[in-house]
C-alpha cells in the first residue's frame, strides 16, 4: 500500500514572498507567492514548487533561519536560503534550499558508542544559534557556521515508566512581531517536562513536570507579548496555558473538539501577531482563538477582574477552506507580510487561502 504524503511543517520567509514545506516523502519544497491580486481564488488551485530536492532518508526535524528570504543580498550573513535537517543515523546538516546541496554537517556523534544521535527537535534563533534536542533530554547549542557544539547538557534524571526522556520541541515565537531574543529558551519533552535552556548556566533547569495521561509535549508557543506560554500535548484534547512567570500551575486551557492522537497526522498550532492562535482540524477546517484572548492568557480583554476564572475555552471561530473535508488540515501558518493570507497543508498538497474563506 502506497504511503500517503503528508506535510510535516511550513516555514514562511521573513518578507512573506516565499515559503518552504517539508514532507514525509523526504522532500523539501520552496514556493513563491503568486503576484495575483485576487488570492481568494488560490485555495482552489494547487501550488507548484519553485525549487525542490529530496534527501535519501526521512526527516525527523528541521528548522529555517528566522531571517530566511530569497532576496537576501547581505553576504556577511549565513542566512538566506538555508535549512537545517536532522535524521536517524545521520549528522545534523545545513542545506541550501536553492540547489539542495549540503553546506555543513554538525558533530552530533555520541562519543561513547560512535553513533550519530538522532536530533528530534531543532531551532535556529535570531542570533544564528542552532539548538538541538535528543535522547536523555540532551540539548546542544551550535554556532550555525561551525560544526562543533559550543554548549551541551544532558539530564541525569530518568523518565517515569512509560515516558520518553527526549527533547521533543523548542519554544516557538510569533513571526512578524518579535525580532529580538527574549533571553532563555523553553523546551519540552515527551515525558511532559518543560525545561529552560540558558547557555550562561551549566545545566538545564526543569520548570514544569505534569503528571497527565497526555503522551508528551509536542509544541510550546509563546504569545506576542512573551507573557504566556501555550503547550500542545499528544493524546490530549486541550492546549494548556501558563503564565511564563509561573510555569508550575496551569492558568487556563483551550478546548479542542478532537484529540491529538499519537499516530495521527501532525496537527500543528500557530500563533501570529494579527489573528492569535490557529490550528487545523481532522475535518479540514481551521480553529482560531483571537489575538486579544491569546495575549491575555486565555482571558478575553473585555472581562473584568471580578469575572470567574475561565478554565476551558472553546474556539472563538472556525473557518472553512472550501477543500475536501475528509483530509486533515495539518499545518496552517500566516504570511508575515499579509496576515490574512495563510499557507495551508491539506494532506500532501499546499494551498494559499484567506482567513474566513
From Swiss-Prot:
Annotated protein name in UniProt? Protein SWT21
Keyword check for Nucleus: yes
Q: Which Gene3D superfamilies match?
A: YVTN repeat-like/Quinoprotein amine dehydrogenase (2.130.10.10)
- Identify the InterPro entries for this entry: SWT21/TCAB1_mRNA_Telomere (IPR051150), WD40/YVTN_repeat-like_dom_sf (IPR015943), WD40_repeat_dom_sf (IPR036322)
Q: Spell out where the chain crosses the membrane.
A: none
PANTHER family, alphabetized = TELOMERASE CAJAL BODY PROTEIN 1
Q: Which GO terms describe its cellular component?
A: nucleus
Q: Where in the cell is it found?
A: Nucleus
Q: What's the main place this protein lives?
A: nucleus
